[in-house]
Amino acid sequence: MELKQWHDFCLCPLGGACPPDAVPADAPFSPLVFLVRRDPLRSRGLFAVTVLDEVFEAETAGVLLPPVQRPTPAEPLREFVAANGACVLNTAFSAAFSVLERWNRERTEPLRVTLVGLGDVGGTLLLALKLLGREIGALRIYDPNAAQCRRYELELNQVLPLDHPLPPVTVCTEDTLFDCDLLLFTASRGVPPVGSGVADVRLAQYEKNRVMLRSYAAMARKTHFTGLFCQISDPVDPLACAVFRESNRNAAGEFDGCGLLPEQVQGFGLGVMEARARWCAQEDGIDFSNGRVYGPHGGGLVAANDPAAYDKAVSARLTERAVHANLEVRALGFKPYLAPALSSAAVSILSLVRGQPYDAALPLGGVWLGAQRRMTPLGPLQRREPLHPALLARFEAARLELEAFCHDA
């Protein structure tokens, strides 16, 4: 395999093009980047691998399983990847190398975070990040309601620290939204009121929120944003897909791959489903110490008592309870926003920036589907482990269902 050096990266072109100023390299070194060129609508953009065979595998439910290693003679690159790791970069995206450099850059300053939307979820998330976000150097807030922004700016800058400095809260303008490392999007339209009788609240919000997100996706494109767009408002998974696609449309509405990479858009709705499954398991006396959740936030969720020792009946009951747990809160006359804001957003996002495992929806075969991953400088690293065949089939069914929805929407 050909190797080239570009800046501090070792590039290995496998169909993807090297930058023109790349020069030949004699031996592999870290970070090693495999360059591919794949359909940008249905392929990942930047992701970490630990085994050479992961570079070539199809984007199906199989990415949850331990990678299948071909019985080939020892290869220098195979041994190098096993020892040092690597990543795959899809050069079909015009911003591929810019994002690669940004994510690999050593962080010398605290994170700058922009929060869009100060409703119930946004306000709760802001409180959590103010108190817990020791990695955050600036919390920038934006909401069309100027009084709401000013209120949070005043009150949260009057909070005393407990054991670490607290990030200042400042109001930002629309034209500086993407001057940050992470943009957290919680704004929402058309949330059905309590008692409305709407069966699937998340899907009822989809079209209105999708329209609202178009302008923000266009701004991300215009500003050449290389950070993370964290989609939090519902329905998380299809809206994350919509943000990615809208950011990659030109003025004529054509997809051109000149916007965000798929992994730059991550959906945060799965954390609360894990928390609900754990709570329901505790109430029902079910061992969830090795439990997992996969798939979309809401309908299509897959909760499993154990990835390998999978009990279909027990897991089906857990899934049903987790999916409908929010309705119990609505039946009491309240909007169920506290647990999602804390579990899906605050805890998951802080786990991401700390390099810890976190629940989120990321791209797989052109749709955004939830599973556990860990963020690295080489992109997200998928958690891979043996899965019961029935559980794997459920995950693949959820993926295909979401694929049909997203591609028809």
Which residues are covered by each model-predicted region?
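Glycine/serine-rich phosphate-binding loop and adjoining beta1-alpha1 elements at the start
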Residues: 1-110
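Long, compositionally biased stretches enriched for glycine and/or charged residues
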Residues: 52-70, 282-409
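Hydrophobic/small residue at the entry helix of a nucleotide-binding pocket
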Residues: 120-124
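Short beta-strand element of Class I
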Residues: 136-140
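Conserved N-terminal Rossmann-fold NAD(P) cofactor-binding segment
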Residues: 142-180
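Rossmann-like NAD(P)-binding element
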Residues: 166-226
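Rossmann-like dinucleotide-binding core of oxidoreductases
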Residues: 233-306
